[in-house]
């Protein structure tokens, strides 16, 4: 898997991702963060969002997911970006139902370790 330094990102996207990654690792039980979607593939345009897969050590309820969304709000406003998150326990990503979905293949192929 490529690292974030190997991806051609605009400055505001890079800053937003760096801040989001730091905040998420410090504030939540995140095991791994992966950039995916058009930005990871290098096919983004001015309307593209930042897609982040957040793999957690445990299942998060709706309150935990909302806390992540709320925590990212200021970063989105500051940098003028939209950050979309897919939050999953790491065991579901590696062994659960997601292993057979097309999004799993896409992220395994094009995902970028953030």
Q: Where in this protein do the model-derived segments appear?
A:
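Glycine-rich beta-strand-to-loop/alpha-helix junction loops that act as flexible
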Residues: 36-38
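Catalytic core of pol beta-like nucleotidyltransferases
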Residues: 1-32, 41-46, 56-114
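Short beta-strand->loop micro-motif that forms the acidic, two-metal-ion catalytic signature
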Residues: 51-55
């Amino acid at each position: 898997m490529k690292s974030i330094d190997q991806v051609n990102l605009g400055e505001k996207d890079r800053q937003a991702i760096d801040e989001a990654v730091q905040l998420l690792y410090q504030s939540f039980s995140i095991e791994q963060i992966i950039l995916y979607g058009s930005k990871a593939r290098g096919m983004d345009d001015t309307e593209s969002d930042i897609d982040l897969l957040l793999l957690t050590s445990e299942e998060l309820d709706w309150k935990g997911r909302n806390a992540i969304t709320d925590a990212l709000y200021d970063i989105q406003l500051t940098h003028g970006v939209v950050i979309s998150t897919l939050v999953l326990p790491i065991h579901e990503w590696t062994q659960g139902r997601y292993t057979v979905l097309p999004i799993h293949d896409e992220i395994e192929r094009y995902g970028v370790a953030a």
